[in-house]
Amino acid sequence: MVVIAALLGSLAVLAFLFYLWYLTIFIIVHKNQQYLEQTKALYNKLKLSNFNSVIVPFQLLRSEKKALEQPVKLLKSFQESFNSEINSALEQLLVFSEPKALYNCFWFNRNIKLLRKNLQGLHDKQQRYVKLTKNAIAYFDSSYDTLVFYRQAFCLLVSFINDFLVHKYDSLFYLNIINRISLLFKDVELHIKNKDVKQQNQALNKLHNNLAQTIITASRQYFFDVKVGYLNYHFQILSQKVTQLRSMKNKAINSQEVAKFQELITNIGATLAECSQALGNINLALCEQRINQAKEQIDVLSNAVSVKEKAISLVVSNVDSFLKSINHYQQQNALLQTLMKEIELMFQNNLDTVNIINQINEHSLLIAQKTQLLNQENALTEFIDYEKLFRLMSEAMKLLDGLKNLLNELFALSANKFDDYRFFVYTLDDFRFKFFQIENLIANEELIISEKTLKIISQAKHQFDDIFTQAKNDYEGAFSYLNEKVRFFQNQLTHVIVDVVGLMNLRSMCKHTFIFANKYRQESPQINESLETLTQFYQQQNYSETLSGLISLLGKIKSSAKQHHLDLN
């Protein structure tokens, strides 16, 4: 049995070692397989490199065959070397891909790393090669892109000219330009086809300059054409407005204003005609000058018409609305006068308030007079002097503005006075309430107050009543009197509070002292007799004498206890 057990144990150890060996081989082979796949991926990436797309542009860029002969030889030499190394790498990869190679761990690991290093170096060379040659490729490809871009721009330019300019202006001018640009396109295409870079660049520059200049000319002519059209339209509207102003009756516009408007219209018409002529001749510099000149002239005319329209709108169109507003004010004036009387009665002794109310009454009277004149002038049927009507309206508006300012000033002053009055009432009520509280406290506590304190309370109450009565008839005087007496009333109130509170504090201390002294009432007839006497003082509210007697009695009790070696609680 022992031998069998030993054999089984040996077999188990061998099995474990075999499993461990198998696992190690599996991991190494799997790792080699991954490394091989990575190397194949790098090889495939390099294999896709196409150097013909780089070499051909260099061959096409030279205008003479020997100009780039040496660079092209170097490029081809690099291509042959690159292809040779790629093919060699392929042969090695085929060997490494065999199954038995994966299990030759040390050999595989050493050689695959060497191949990977060679491929990485080849990749770096390829990147430097591309970096050195990409500018030439970009230049070669951009020639076609530039030509296509210019062709598209030229087509758009031709469409723009046909749509907006040819039917109005000199078509022969643009026809010659279009033909010249078309010939330049043919020259560029020919030079690109012949791979003549120098001539190609010269032709492209010439094409660019002609195309850009034509675009600028066409766009400016169109822009000026739109401007002139807008100015003509605006001028036409202003001319119609001037005609309407001239056709209005009465004094809407006088002869001097008519002459001024006519002079402006004549000058603007001549300037706009010069603008159109300069556009037709494609004299854009002169056209721009005349456009600016016409714009300034139209601005002057527009401002003059606008000012006149606003004046007429204010005087003629809105005169009824103004009269309705001012007549409505006259209807509300009775309410305003009633309010003024109330304010005057309340602040009759205040000089500032009275002066403002007098000014308001004067303004109200003048506004009533202006309103009557306006109604009379507007009621005329045959002829209305709008200048006079406008003057009356302006004067009435100034009076209304002045009245508004006076009312705001009066209301602000009244609000301040009301704040003063509210402070006056609050202060007086506060004093009365505090004295009332003290009276209630004296009554509730049944305190015997000194005659002086009672007299102060009584006099203060009567003074407060007198101030309230005075305020009904003379608020200013009552307010001034209260301001003068505030400190006096405060001192009187403080005196009363100190007297009452002091009396209550003495009574409270007497109560607490009696509680302690009564514990020793039965200790001695003398103590009992003294406490009876002090109780009579307390009932008579002679708290000061009571407290002094209690303190003296407690001192005697303490001394007696100390002599007899007694402990007091």
From Swiss-Prot:
It comes from the Bacteria. Keywords: Membrane, Transmembrane, Transmembrane helix. The chain crosses the membrane at residues 2-22. GO terms for cellular component: membrane. It is a single-pass membrane protein. It is found in: Membrane. This is Uncharacterized protein MG397 homolog. It comes from Mycoplasma pneumoniae (strain ATCC 29342 / M129 / Subtype 1).
